[in-house]
């Protein structure tokens, strides 16, 4: 922690300062997670960081994951994905993490979306690239069928409703 503060005090180029601030949040103790999230959200709101939103929200998502708060982690990762402007390795890492969460939760459509985009952003030399590639191919084949099952389930649920409930659901 002291080393990161020392780096920031030396007025380095902004990208180095930014990375030091992100790294500081990762080494803070778990009891300071609310403080870390507030600090990162302030960073996300700053115009200086608009090109780094994927990294900021990735760090926020990781804090939530360390607290076993998957719902808020997914929300943070999705914000990082939608706010990303550079489409670099950082976004690929974020999408891989998000895809893994969706895979574990059996939300295969969302996992396919994340893995499909991540595969084009990440280096083929990564140790987990083969697994990413395998999952992406499996999901490309699986998702059309799971989508059909979800559609049929929804249609059958609508068919079982009385007319008033069905009309409310449709509207």
Describe each model-derived feature in a short phrase:
Residues 1-171:
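Acidic, polar-rich low-complexity tracts and alpha-helical solenoid repeat scaffolds
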């Amino acid at each position: 922690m002291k080393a990161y503060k020392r780096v920031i005090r030396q007025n380095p180029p902004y990208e180095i300062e930014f990375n030091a601030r992100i790294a500081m949040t990762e080494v803070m103790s778990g009891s300071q997670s609310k403080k870390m999230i507030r600090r990162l959200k302030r960073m996300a709101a700053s115009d200086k960081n608009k090109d780094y939103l994927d990294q900021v929200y990735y760090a926020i998502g990781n804090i939530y994951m360390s607290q076993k708060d998957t719902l808020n982690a997914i929300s943070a990762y999705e914000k990082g994905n939608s706010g990303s402007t550079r489409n670099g390795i950082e976004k690929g890492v974020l999408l891989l993490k998000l895809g893994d969460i969706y895979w574990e939760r059996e939300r295969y459509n969302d996992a396919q979306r994340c893995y499909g985009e991540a595969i084009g952003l990440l280096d083929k030399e990564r140790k987990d690239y083969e697994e990413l590639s395998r999952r992406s191919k499996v999901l490309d084949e699986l998702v059309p069928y799971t989508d059909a099952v979800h559609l049929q389930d929804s249609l059958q649920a609508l068919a079982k409703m009385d007319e008033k409930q069905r009309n409310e659901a449709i509207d």
